[in-house]
């Protein structure tokens, strides 16, 4: 890691570097753009480019100082069309007061004032310059500065501040957005000093599978006492007694269904038989005489 070009107060701690490495923020793509070469540390034998996490931290601090210089936090727009970054930008907006566009960017949001989604931000921050190309293109039309999380192969056209990091992994994206939000709050004074840890865990910025969240919600909403009473008791509303031979209330317990009830005579089926019908042949002969 190259020596930091920052004042000593902004130097990264060993914990910060360990978090960047644990989230694999240094793992770049196999392709390398010419404008991303200054942020390259080395290339592995398998062709994967390794980014310099020292440069990543310097750009995080620079971006945070730019964000903190804007008086109204609502004038900052954070954008992520990539699913892995949508949760991160929403949390960043909630903690810093910025506007979030998570999902598809509506064309004309920065240039067409007739649309309902029209915005006039003073700064935009995008998760991936490739997937958020429409937002960067419109920002260039109206002179909006752009901060972007750039991988080794990301296009840097119209990007003013590039934060070199892995922008395809959910842990890397969440970690960089979390560090950026923490640094902004430190510069604003929301976090008292740099020795005070932020009470928000980095896991809150990580992408979570919607199906996994739905399963966890079902587990949390499960009715209490299922283990004690049994599933059948919960569904039927009656406790499971385990005695299937017990008769329900209001009905006598009988041994065999073939046994006659006590005090009642067996029915005589011959006595109730219907009377014999007339001769069908004679009836038909009378009808034919007409």
From Swiss-Prot:
The keyword Ribonucleoprotein applies. Residues 257-271 have a biased composition (Low complexity). The gene is rps-0. Keywords: Cytoplasm, Ribonucleoprotein, Ribosomal protein. It comes from Neurospora crassa (strain ATCC 24698 / 74-OR23-1A / CBS 708.71 / DSM 1257 / FGSC 987). This is Small ribosomal subunit protein uS11. Residues 243-271 are annotated as: Disordered. PROSITE patterns: RIBOSOMAL_S2_2. GO terms for molecular function: structural constituent of ribosome. Component of the small ribosomal subunit (SSU). Mature N.crassa ribosomes consist of a small (40S) and a large (60S) subunit. The 40S small subunit contains 1 molecule of ribosomal RNA (18S rRNA) and at least 32 different proteins. The large 60S subunit contains 3 rRNA molecules (26S, 5.8S and 5S rRNA) and at least 42 different proteins. Interacts with rps21. The keyword Chaperone does not apply. Coiled coil: none annotated. GO terms for biological process: cytoplasmic translation; ribosomal small subunit assembly. Component of the ribosome, a large ribonucleoprotein complex responsible for the synthesis of proteins in the cell. The small ribosomal subunit (SSU) binds messenger RNAs (mRNAs) and translates the encoded message by selecting cognate aminoacyl-transfer RNA (tRNA) molecules. The large subunit (LSU) contains the ribosomal catalytic site termed the peptidyl transferase center (PTC), which catalyzes the formation of peptide bonds, thereby polymerizing the amino acids delivered by tRNAs into a polypeptide chain. Gene3D superfamilies: Glucose-6-phosphate isomerase like protein, domain 1. Belongs to the universal ribosomal protein uS2 family. It is found in: Cytoplasm. The lineage of its organism: Eukaryota, Fungi, Dikarya, Ascomycota, Pezizomycotina. InterPro entries: Ribosomal_uS2, Ribosomal_uS2_CS, Ribosomal_uS2_euk, Ribosomal_uS2_euk/arc, Ribosomal_uS2_flav_dom_sf.
């Amino acid at each position: 890691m190259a020596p930091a070009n920052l004042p000593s107060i902004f130097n990264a701690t060993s914990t910060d570097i360990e978090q960047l490495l644990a989230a694999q923020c240094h793992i770049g793509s196999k392709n390398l753009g010419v404008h991303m070469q200054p942020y390259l540390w080395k290339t592995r034998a398998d062709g994967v480019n390794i980014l310099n996490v020292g440069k990543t931290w310097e750009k995080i601090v620079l971006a945070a100082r730019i964000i903190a210089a804007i008086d109204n936090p609502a004038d900052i727009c954070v954008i992520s069309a990539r699913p892995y970054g949508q949760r991160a930008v929403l949390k960043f907006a909630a903690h810093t007061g910025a506007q979030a566009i998570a999902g598809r960017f509506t064309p004309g949001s920065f240039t067409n004032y007739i649309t309902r989604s029209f915005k006039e931000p003073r700064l935009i921050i995008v998760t991936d310059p490739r997937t958020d190309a429409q937002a960067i293109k419109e920002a260039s039309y109206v002179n909006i500065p752009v901060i972007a999380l750039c991988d080794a192969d990301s296009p840097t056209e119209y990007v003013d501040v590039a934060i070199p990091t892995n922008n395809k992994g959910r842990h890397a994206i969440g970690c960089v957005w979390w560090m950026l939000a923490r640094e902004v709050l430190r510069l604003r004074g929301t976090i008292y000093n740099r020795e005070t840890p932020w009470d928000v865990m980095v896991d809150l910025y990580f992408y979570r599978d919607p199906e996994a969240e739905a399963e966890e919600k079902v587990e949390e909403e499960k009715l209490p006492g299922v283990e004690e009473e049994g599933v059948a008791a919960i569904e039927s509303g009656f406790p499971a007694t385990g005695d299937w031979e017990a008769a329900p209330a209001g009905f006598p317990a009988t041994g065999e269904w073939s046994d006659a009830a006590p005090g009642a005579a067996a029915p005589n089926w011959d006595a109730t038989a219907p009377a014999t019908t007339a001769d069908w042949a004679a009836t038909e002969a009378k009808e034919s005489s007409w």
